[in-house]
Swiss-Prot record:
Family, per entry: Belongs to the CorA metal ion transporter (MIT) (TC 1.A.35.5) family.
Cellular compartments per GO CC: membrane
Family matches, as InterPro entries: MRS2-like
Subcellular localization, as worded in the UniProt entry: Membrane
Pfam families: MRS2-like (PF22099)
Species: Arabidopsis thaliana
Membrane topology: Multi-pass membrane protein
Role description: Magnesium transporter that may mediate the influx of magnesium.
Protein name: Magnesium transporter MRS2-8
Length: 380
């Protein structure tokens, strides 16, 4: 190392120790939490792999995961954990999250008033929507409305840009359409992923039943399950612990929701179907826009092919003319040389040779054009 060389300190990137969360309970009360991720895992009883999909520093596709005590949502800018009593939303600087938080507070508090504030322990009334369903509905409505608004905004920008491009093909219009097409591709992928998640849930009744947290919470506190307190003990082996956890989960579900699975699934199915239809309409709009873009590209390709054909036609004419002029120039050049031969002593011979050569060149040009037309090289 040289003596005058300075050492540049390298800043080590460390993982984020704590995340900022916004907790909204059944009364609509908002509380800001700045806690470690392990506290959140213990609070909502989920695994680290489930919490990892909510990490803002990592990119994960949209997902709706039903767990024993929580529903994990990763819907673009909405990263939340729904339990039977509260909603934990990851706080971020995204301005699109602000109206979603306000909607959570409003809808959850209104829903709580509709219930009359009657919650007997962890049991929710049969004829009322559970807290987790109301929270899930707010989240799905927010993301569906957000994507629909972005689609409408994209349509307002894309259709005029495409029409202008068909009228005037310039590099500026091409660049503008290229950017809009990239935005459309990203938006279509986002909408398609959420649609796939909803469709996957609708196709599996067990996954939909997993979303009924209040029912499972009520079953967990029933005497049939309390009599087996030894199930709550977890050994040190993570593999055995995971197996016991799954066995307990299956026991809770079989003991509590055996007679009510059908009603639970129907309620969740109606909730998911409504938003599935909404996101499907948004995807149809994007599909129509994609088809319009493809039609515009086909039209532009036809225009480019026509222009290319015109250039080829012009090139053929120039080539034929160049050949004829070259032949004429060769003959005239030979006669213009100072070389003695018998034609020089004959009067008017030069004029006849020049005019005859010009006539032959003209006939040659017409012959080339006729042959090109016969082969339909000119398109007519």
């Amino acid at each position: 190392m040289l003596p005058n060389e300075e050492l540049v300190p390298v800043k080590r990137i460390t993982p984020q120790s704590s995340w900022s969360w916004i907790s909204i309970d059944a009364t609509g009360k908002k509380t800001v939490l700045d806690v470690d991720k392990y506290v959140i895992m213990h609070r909502v009883q989920i695994h680290a792999r489930d919490l990892r999909i909510l990490d803002p520093n990592l990119f994960y596709p949209s997902a709706i995961l039903g767990r024993e005590r929580a529903i994990v949502l990763n819907l673009e800018h909405i990263k939340a954990i729904i339990t039977a009593k509260e909603v934990l939303i990851q706080d971020s600087s995204d301005e699109n999250l602000i109206p979603t938080l306000e909607e959570f507070q409003t809808r959850l508090s209104v829903g709580n008033k509709a219930h009359g504030g009657q919650l007997d322990g962890d049991v929710v009334e049969e004829d009322e929507s559970a807290f987790e369903f109301r929270a899930l509905e707010v989240a799905l409505e927010a993301i569906c409305s957000f994507l629909a608004a972005r689609t409408i905004e994209l349509e307002k920008s894309a259709y005029p840009a495409l029409d202008e491009l068909t009228l005037k093909l310039t590099s500026r219009n091409l660049l503008r359409v290229c950017k809009l097409k990239s935005s459309m591709t990203r938006l279509t992928a986002q909408v398609q992923k959420i649609k796939d998640e909803l469709e996957q849930l609708l196709e599996d009744d067990e996954d939909m039943a997993e979303l009924y947290l209040s029912r499972k919470l009520a079953g967990a506190s029933s005497p049939a399950i309390d009599s087996g307190e030894h199930i709550n003990w977890y050994p040190t082996s993570p593999t055995i612990g995971a197996k016991i956890s799954r066995a307990k989960s299956h026991l809770v579900r079989s003991a509590t929701v055996r007679g009510d699975d059908k009603n639970d699934v129907e309620e969740v199915e109606m909730l998911l179907e409504a938003h599935f239809m909404q996101i499907d309409r948004t995807l149809n709009k994007l599909t129509e826009l994609r088809e319009y873009v493809d039609e515009t590209e086909d039209f532009l390709n036809i225009q480019l092919d026509s222009s290319r054909n015109q250039l080829i036609k012009f090139e053929i004419i120039l080539t034929a003319g160049s050949i004829c002029v070259s032949v004429y120039s060769v003959v005239v050049g030979i006669l213009g040389m100072n070389i003695p031969f018998p034609w020089n002593i004959k009067k008017h011979m030069f004029k006849w040779v020049v005019s005859g050569t010009a006539t032959v060149c003209a006939i040659l040009f017409v012959t080339i054009m006729s042959f090109a037309r016969y082969k339909k090289l000119f398109g007519f």
